[in-house]
Each structure stands twice: as C-alpha cells, then as structure tokens.
C-alpha cells in the first residue's frame, strides 16, 4: 500500500498520506491517529455492522460513521464541521510488484441533510491516485465531485473499473484483487487493530488459522435412512395386518346385528297391519252411535221452532196495540223534546265555561305583554301600550260579567285583535334579524376556533396564497436556498412602536424572501404556477438587488425599532423603513417627507392618513406575535360566545310571544259571537220545565197493562229461541264429530293398504334368505295371548337396542377405517356398506415375503457401516493430519525468532472432550474391510458404534460437532526458555501487560502469515495503539519478525513508544491538529527503490 487520500473525513478536508514498508503513525492524544486507521476499516471491511470505530479504546469508544463523515465537534453553537449535503472519499493506492503496475481502491459516500448515506465502492486497475480527479470547478470555485458525477467520469476514463453499490460484492472483488484472500481476512484485520486478550485459543485458531472443511456424510446417512425405512416398513406391515384383521372382525359383528334388525322389522310390519285393522272396526262402531244421536236432535229442534213462532206472533200483536195508543205517542214526543233540549243546553253551558276561562287567560296574556320590558331588538310603543291597557280592562269586565257584552265591548275586542296582530308581525321581523345575526356570529366563532388551534400549533394564520408560494419554493429549491416570510424573521425592540410597524408594513409583512443567488429561479417558479395555484397578490422580494439598501438608514427612522434575523431580512427592513421617520406627535409629521407617529398617523406625499385599526390590531411580527394573536383571538371568542348566548335567549323569547299572539284576532271574533250565550241557556231551561209538567199529567194505566203482556210473550220467545240455538249447536257438533270419524276411517283404510303393501315389500328391501326365519318369528309372536300393542312395543324395544348396538359397532368400524386410512395413506371408503377394499388389502399383506424384507434390512446396515469406515474415518484422519502439518510449518517459522530468551510454539493435541473419538479415528487398525461389529477391540468397537450412531441419527445439523475435524483437537501457545515451558492459557491469568501482548502479536502475525501463504498478496498488517504495553526490546523484536515475514506494517503508536520503533521503521507519520483541521508530516521517507515497490525478502523459505 503506497498512499491513502482522505477527503471530507472527520477533520481531514483533503489529505494524502504516503506509506513505506514499515510505517508508524504518531501524534498527541486526540490528534487523529485512530481516524486514519478507521478510514482503512471502512475501506477494507466495508460492512458498517462489522466495524468498531476507535477499537483500541475498548468499550469507551462511541464513534459512529456519521460523526466521522460530518466531523463531530460537539458544541451547541456548531455540532459538526460539515452540515447539509456533501460527498466523502476514502481512496488507497497499491503497487502490484508481480504485475509491475498500480491500482486504486476507494469508497465515495453522499451524505444528505437528514444524515441519509449512499455508498459506492470502486476498484480501478492500472491507475494511481494522482491520475484521478475528485474535484470540479464552477463559477471559479472548487467543489468536491458528487458521487454520481465522479462514477460517471471513472467509467469513461477507466472502462475496466469495478464500481459496486453492494458492500458484499465489493468485498468479494477486493479479496480477489488482494491475491485471492480468504474471507477470514476481514475478521483477522479487525482483530489486529487493538490488543484484545485471547481468552479462548481454540476460538482464535478457528477464526484465524484452520479453515473449516466440509466432510460429506450424505451417502452414509442416506444408506442408513434406507435401512431405517425398510425397518419401519416391516413394522408397518405387521401393524397393518393386525389393524385390518380387527376391521374385518368388527364388520362381521355388524353383519350379524343387521340380520337381527331385518327380521325384527318384518315382525313389526305384520303387527302394525293387525293393529290398523282393529282401529278400523272401532271407527265403524263410533259412526253408528253418532248417526242415531243426530236424528234425535233434529226432531227436538223442529218442535221448538214451532213454539218459538207462536210466541213471536203474540209479541207482534201487543206491539201493534201499544204503538197505536194516543198516550204512547204523546209520552214519546215529550220525552224526545226534553232529551234534545237538555243536550243542547248542556252544550251551551260547556261552551260558556270554555269561553269564560279563555277570557281570563287572554286577560293574563295581555297583562304580561303590557309588562314586557323589551330590549335593543324590540320594545312596545306608547300607543301599543295604551291599546293593550284598554283591551285588558275589557277582558277583565267580560270575565267578571259571565261573558256577556255589548257594542262597546265588541268594538274594543276588534281593536285589540288588530293591535296584537301588528305586534306579532314586529316580533316576526325581529326574530328574523336575530337569526341572521346568530348565523354571522357562529361563522365568526368557527373562524376564530380554527385560528386559535393553528396558533397553538405555532402556525400563523397567513393568507392561503402566501403559504402555497412558500411551500412551492421550499419544494423546488430544497437545499439550494432557505425560504422566509418576512414577519417571522423580525423582532421589535420597543413595543411602543409595534402598532406603527405592523400598520405601516401592512401586507408587506407577508412578503417572501429567498437567498439572493436564487431569486431569479424563484421568480420563474412563481410565474409558472401563479394561475394554477392562485398565487396572485403575494410579494416575492428581489433580495439580490435589495442588498444595496443594507445599512442605508436615516437617524430616527422606524427601521431603528426593528431587527432582522439575517442580512437578507435586514436589507428588506432598511429598504422599507430606513426613510420613515418616527414623529412624536401629529404636528411633527410635517417636518419630514415620510413619517409616522406611535398612534399610527402616517404622513407621505403631503397626505396624512390614520392607519385603520384592523390593519395592525392583529400582530404578526416577532417571536411573541403568536402569543399576542392568541390572546386577542381568545378574547374575541369570549365576546362572540357571550353575544351568541344573548341572541339565542332573545330568539327563544320572541318565538314564545309569536306563539302566544298567533290567531288572537280570530279568537276575539269568536268571543263576540258568545256574548248572548246566557239568554239562550235561560230559554232552553224554560221549555224543559214546561214539557216535564205536561208529561206528569198523562193517564198511562191502560198502556202499562199492554206493556206487561208484551213483556210476558217476549220472555217466552227468548226462551224458545235459546233452546233452538242450543239444539242447532248440538246438531253441528254431532255432524262435525261424524265427519271427523268418517275421515279417520278413510285414513285408517288407506293406511291399512299402505302397511300391507310395505309388509309385502320387505322381501325386496332386505336379504331374501332371511324371509323364512322372519315368517317363523312372526307366527311365534302372534300365537301368544298378549295384546298386539304390547307385543309390538316389545319388538320395537328389542329392535331399537339392536340398532343402537349396530350404530355403535358401525361407528367403531368407521373410526377404525378412518384411523387406518390416515395412518396408512389408504384410499378405502370409510362409509362403505361392504368390506371388500379392506379385505383385499388384508389378503395382499398376507401374501408378502417377510423374511426377504428382514434380509434387505441387514444388508443396508452393513453398507452404511462400510461407508462410515471407508469415507468418514479416513477423511477425518486425513484432515487432522493436515492440521498438524500446517501447525508444524507455522512453528518452523516461529522457531527462528527469540523474544529475549523466549521462543514461541503452537501446541496441538487431542481434545479432552472428544479424545475417545480421536483415538479411534487415528487408530490405523480401523480399516474399511473390518466391520464395526467384528472389530477385535470391543472398547474401540463400542466407540465406533457410538460415533456412527451420533452421525446417522437425527436431522442434518444436529451433530455438526462430530463432522468438524477441529473439534477433535485442543490448541495452545507455548513460551519456551532456559527455565522451562509455559503456556499462554496460564500466562493470560498470571503475567503483566507486555508479557501478555507478545503472545497476542505472535498469534496475530501467525494468522496473517497463514492468510498470506500465496506470495502475490497485499501482505498488509495494521495495528492501532500498537505495542503500548511492551518494552523496547520486545517492540524491536516484533518489528524484525514482521520484516522477516515480509509483511507491510502500518501502526498507530503512542508518542512514548515512537523512539523505540524509529530504528526499525522506514517511515514515520506525525498527525497534527489545529482547531478542527488535521494534517500530516512525514519525518522520514522510504528509500527510492521502496517508493516503486516494497523490497522482497526471502522469508517464505522459512515456511515452505
């Protein structure tokens, strides 16, 4: 690796760093050493989830990629060096010694305002960093190239370049370009960045030295599974046979029960025919009895009808005599006259009572109206009150005079009715006005509530066109310019001049401003959309030209009382108010060309004009304007709601009076018609008394005698008529009963025919071979002396019992069939009446050759054992032996170096946990031709069987531990000297930091050496805070070992270790930081030949 270029990375704006074969990076704490190392992490590891920034800081590190990209400062005034949108580049240059050419790798990161990141990785062959441009020029200004433009340019300049958005694809391409490195490179590279104690040597070896080797056991498992399947199939055949035999037995029981039920059904049908014949005989006897009873009732009815007719004639005779009597006629006439007169007199009395009561109510209503106080919407006139007083007195007079009145009262009531009609009309008009006012108030209330809600959300109530234009510009300009509404960016210094400022600026408070260089663009957008969005009337300030007004303010001007949030806004205020002078009073206005008083009297072009209150009463300027608007709006809302309540009360009150006064004029005309009611009542009473006197003088003795005779014959007629009715009713009942019995007899005869037919059809419905037995059972049943009904009940109970047994057995049969179908995937019909399908299945199983099955099972087990010995054992033994050879090579290289008096060696030995399996795997006596079950050593044979069972039983992946050859080994690192041998596992718990760091670096270097077995690789090792706990001698020995292994070193080291490493390093880079900018100094440079390519050293001979 020759160079690293950092653009917009933390505090590096654009820095190129040169590397030699042995490079150390130093600087004060916080200067930015780890920043360089973390840039290499982003470049090599690429997957952000796998990167631990500033990893040498252990758990205290809390850096993130976005903090590096933006350059986190951490102060409230300025949290980051870079804000908004920008692009970062991290680029490295490598020299391929074998090919004799350079290549470049890198990453570009677009960072957006919301911290969203877009990454693109690139690998450029046959190129150098100085051949690539990362900047572009616009308007004589130098800008970092955007990602899209950069990638487009790279594709054109270097057609063979690899550009990837996927970190995974980039990682694969990068490892291939680095010499076909194993993917373990990423973990080893990250682990080397800081000292981390190796608490598990086996885990370290797995990740950094020994590769996983997939050992296929599929064939062995498949053979064993075939054996298991055959074994299961044999067991299944036996189970099937047993299940089918059970189904067959149950079916035979069902057939027996079905035959019993069939015979019982034959007997029951015969008994049912005998019973229906008995019922027919009973119906015929009942018909004879009903016909006899009907004849007697008809004879009695005829005789009673003759007696009733004689009584009716006598009754008619006496009715004629009474009707022709003169006394009867006069008596009836007088009674009818008296009854009619009483009725009409009663009606008049009722009308009079209602009339008098209405007069009292009317007097009360008129008195209430006369006392009505009125309000601003309605009040009574003096004339109206005078008319009401006269009308009230008239009503009171009539009420106390029993409703009787004359011409004067008639005239008074007519005038009162006309007055009340006019008053009611006025109430109607006032109510309409109030309802219109109520609607206006509700509209105002709704608007105020909306404004208050917006203000509480800190949203000023601007005209819709202002908000639309602001939103439109923000959408199109995005990060190119901010968009302001003037009033939001202003603050008033002295509240005394608030009204003058609000009123003088008026709608200019809502003018929209953009940054000067974007005004022309904003104006084009405004012009394009002004009619589509209804934007007319909104002010868009030419901020570019207005900058000339900044600072041009006359002393004593209104501009002194207001301040803008930025120079663009301030220029606007200086333009609008810089020449408007503050006047103490209205007379002082004339001293100036343009002026205004604190009371909002303006003076301009020789015209004085008071600014309307509605213009300035709602404040918009400044941070406190929203709160002031909110207070004003809430106060207005209270006033409107109070007025709404008052108006609502008035409407309700007026409608009450409208209802009271409705139809008064018509009512009063009816009252006038009732003035003569008393005279009419007196006339009726006089006539009633006269007719009663005449009625009392009539002689009615002869008439009473005739009436007595009529009464006697009437009683006899009623008696005969009742008897005749009773007889008619009895005749109807007898006929109805006779009809019912005849219908029942018809049904019985029909039923008897059907039952007989059903009995005969039995032989077609059931098995014909049962007929003879059924006929015998029938004869036995009817030969007893018991009633047919009792016999039938007995047979029904027996049949029901057999049916229940049959249903139970049938259900059990179907359950067994269903279970068999589900368990054996059989397509038999569960509800089938016969058992043919299951009988056929049973027959097939009975014909199978079971011994042949057993022989096949034995042979497949032997095949699985042979595969286990010939493949698995041999391959596992070979993998373990290869691992030992690999560690021998590493130990051969490590044996050439001493740390003081110490030499290091990897120790590999059988795993304690899996030792029994290890021993049998490595036992040369285990050969493919020897069966597991015929092995001479019984203990070893049992272990082999155990291992075999673990591998073939269970799902794939359950016993992966026995397939990985590394699990059969344990690993350690020994430290050897004249005093003996110690092991790293013990050293980590006992020794000092330097003594524990040395094994760490030995192990890490061994890991890299293993990764770089192929000569043509990058051979790069990077350490952060390297060797910080080692003494000088250990550091120098470690550096020499790195050289001897032909590794390129880049190490960030503490200041105090710099002197110890200078003798062995060929390049020293010092990181400096001033404020929030970092740069590098190179104190010693690589030799001229190293600038072309790193020197080759004959270290591979030690390993090969």
From Swiss-Prot:
BP GO terms, sorted: DNA synthesis involved in DNA repair; double-strand break repair
Entry-linked InterPro entries: P-loop_NTPase
Coiled-coil residue windows: none
Signal peptide (residue range): none
Effect of gene knockout: When this gene is missing the Wadjet system does not confer plasmid-transformation resistance in B.subtilis.
Domain of life: Bacteria
Pfam families: AAA_29, SbcC_Walker_B
Function: Component of antiplasmid transformation system Wadjet type I, composed of JetA, JetB, JetC and JetD. Expression of Wadjet type I in B.subtilis (strain BEST7003) reduces the transformation efficiency of plasmid pHCMC05. May be an ATPase.
Name of the protein this chain belongs to: Wadjet protein JetC
Source organism (scientific name): Bacillus cereus (strain Q1)
